[in-house]
């Protein structure tokens, strides 16, 4: 749907106006309760990982119904981005089911797998934690040496030149550039200069993500980038800036989303529906090519 990027972004400023509290209490929560009942979604604690195709279909239908009614709330403009069923179907129809990533000896197929598919999964390895500057390069090298690795989402930096990284601060820029250059250097040192990256996790802000886009020393066109949904079913201008830049620079965009069990989604039933709806949000709002899910419980 990248070819309709600006049409979708326009809705972040022209959609229906609504205060955030009303969006949550008058639209999102009531609609979630409605679709749980309508589609008879019921969690069985004795069977936490069901193999019920009918249940899976109903969760999907509930998520579509929920997303089309609720949309996505922009916290900066207080506007609700809404989409039609026809637009959603078009986006799903047009979405490729696989992409070629990396290059040369490290080119791989990053693609869809069916339920019970015997095809080998695409493996992105990541420690997903911060490292001290002195160990960062070595940590990247250690992961890149893994033979099963198809792509890397590298460690994060918590400090730069001994200073804590602060979002939207020059120190964040310095740390993110250091992260990007060290990751590229690590890939060269192990003989995998063209391996697929999902980067740069150290860059929290939109301006830092834009700053590390560089074919020579930073994140390249064709690499993966991440943009988060805001819990629940929300976004803001900074997230939209990231999503827009990723498409313009030629990167694969991944949507990060984590429905909170016991929060606005409710219990297991609502969490499953909400997490499925985030796939639709990623596709329509961020024009994302892949999804990373992390539903969680705060207790």
Regions found by a protein language model. Give the residues of each.
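Metallocofactor- and cofactor-centric catalytic cores in central/energy metabolism, strongly enriched
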Residues: 1-213, 228-237
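Glycine-rich anion/phosphate-binding loop at the beta-strand->alpha-helix junction
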Residues: 202-203, 212-299
């Amino acid at each position: 749907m990248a070819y309709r990027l600006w049409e979708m972004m326009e809705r972040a400023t022209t959609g229906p106006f609504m205060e955030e509290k009303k969006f949550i209490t008058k639209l999102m929560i009531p609609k979630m309760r409605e679709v749980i009942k309508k589609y008879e979604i019921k969690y069985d604690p004795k069977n936490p990982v069901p193999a019920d195709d009918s249940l899976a279909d109903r969760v999907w239908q509930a998520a579509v119904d929920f997303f089309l009614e609720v949309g996505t709330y922009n916290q900066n403009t207080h506007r609700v981005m809404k989409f039609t069923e026809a637009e959603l179907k078009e986006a799903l129809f047009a979405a490729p089911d696989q992409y070629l990533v990396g290059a040369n000896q490290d080119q791989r197929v990053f693609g869809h797998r069916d339920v019970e598919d015997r095809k080998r999964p695409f493996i992105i390895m990541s420690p997903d934690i911060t490292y001290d500057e002195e160990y960062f390069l070595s940590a990247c090298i250690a992961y890149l040496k893994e033979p099963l690795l198809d792509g890397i989402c590298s460690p994060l930096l918590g400090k730069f030149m001994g200073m804590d990284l602060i979002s939207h601060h020059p120190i964040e820029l310095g740390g993110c550039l250091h992260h990007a250059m060290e990751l590229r250097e690590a890939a060269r040192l192990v003989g995998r200069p063209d391996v697929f990256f999902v980067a740069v996790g150290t860059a929290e802000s939109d301006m830092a993500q834009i700053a590390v886009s560089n074919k020579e020393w930073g994140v390249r066109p064709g690499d993966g980038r991440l943009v988060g949904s805001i819990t629940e079913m929300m976004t803001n201008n900074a997230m939209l800036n990231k999503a827009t830049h990723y498409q313009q620079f030629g990167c694969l965009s991944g949507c990060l989303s984590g429905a909170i069990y016991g929060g606005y989604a409710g219990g297991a039933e609502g969490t499953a529906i909400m997490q499925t709806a985030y796939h639709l949000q990623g596709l329509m709002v961020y024009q994302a090519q892949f999804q990373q899910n992390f539903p969680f419980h705060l207790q």
